[in-house]
């Protein structure tokens, strides 16, 4: 079963780790879209899961930008 990363786990990461996760998720989404276009995608559900993970990461970063949550690393955005 394809499951994403819960938001509470993302909130425990610092901004640098979140940015790394975001880059990795975008790369995975690109590869999944390429597989879908060529008919090689075996797990269609993974596309939606990765999209939601990207949205969660953006949400956590925006919460920190607005001061709604704190950065566990202690450094400013």
UniProtKB/Swiss-Prot annotation:
One of its GO terms (cellular component) is cytosolic large ribosomal subunit. GO terms for molecular function: structural constituent of ribosome. CDD domains: Ribosomal_L29_HIP (cd00427). InterPro entries: Ribosomal_protein_uL29, Ribosomal_uL29, Ribosomal_uL29_CS, Ribosomal_uL29_sf. GO terms for biological process: translation. It comes from the Bacteria. Keywords: Ribonucleoprotein, Ribosomal protein. Belongs to the universal ribosomal protein uL29 family. This is Large ribosomal subunit protein uL29. The lineage of its organism: Bacteria, Bacillati, Actinomycetota, Actinomycetes, Mycobacteriales.
């Amino acid at each position: 079963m394809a499951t994403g990363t819960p938001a509470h786990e993302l909130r425990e990461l610092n901004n640098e780790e979140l940015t790394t996760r975001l880059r990795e998720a975008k790369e995975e989404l690109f590869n999944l879209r390429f597989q879908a276009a060529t008919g090689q995608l075996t797990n269609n559900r993974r596309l939606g899961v990765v999209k939601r993970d990207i949205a969660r990461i953006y949400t956590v970063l925006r919460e920190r930008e607005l001061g709604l949550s704190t950065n566990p690393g202690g450094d400013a955005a």
